[in-house]
Amino acid sequence: MSARTVVILAVLGIALPGPTPIQAQQTPATNPLDAVPDKMPFDIPYGTPISLERAEAAIAATVAEAKKHDWKLNVAVVDSGGNLVAFQRMDGAQLASIQISEHKARTAVTFRRETKVFENAIQQSNFHYVMTLDGVIASRGGIPLVQGGRLIGAIGCSGGTGSQDEVACKVGAATIK
């Protein structure tokens, strides 16, 4: 029986016994969430919380990068427990981005990964369940601060585009070694 005949019979409401050729050709898609990795992803141990001095140095580097491009950003640094250590609002930075910069930093430290990972999960992989996780902001610009293989805090930037926020924050994160 041809596929055209099956479609005509289906439109007329005539049921056929057993699977139709159209049904037989479809195979269920594999769920990428069913994959079991050998190692725990983003398994970065927490370290001693970042000091105020180092947080301010990371912010200074971030602000210097933003100024090169005339980007007006809010920059927040949190410690390994997600507590605010330092913050700077550049002149003219939008007010809504104050909380967003802190949220990006907290997400990066809490989940031990860049916030871009969540953005990619939603936009590129259709992992919409990410939006149900408490405390997640799925927008780039939150970068973990890792020293000696240990997570000591995170930096978050907001006020520009996601890519601008990310570029500036990575400059600040690079001050931590």
Which sequence ranges carry the predicted segments?
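N-terminal secretory signal peptides that target proteins for export/translocation
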Residues: 1-3
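Bacterial N-terminal signal peptides
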Residues: 6-18
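Sec/Tat signal peptide C-region and signal peptidase I cleavage site
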Residues: 19-24
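Flexible, solvent-exposed loop/hinge segments and secondary-structure transition points
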Residues: 25-177
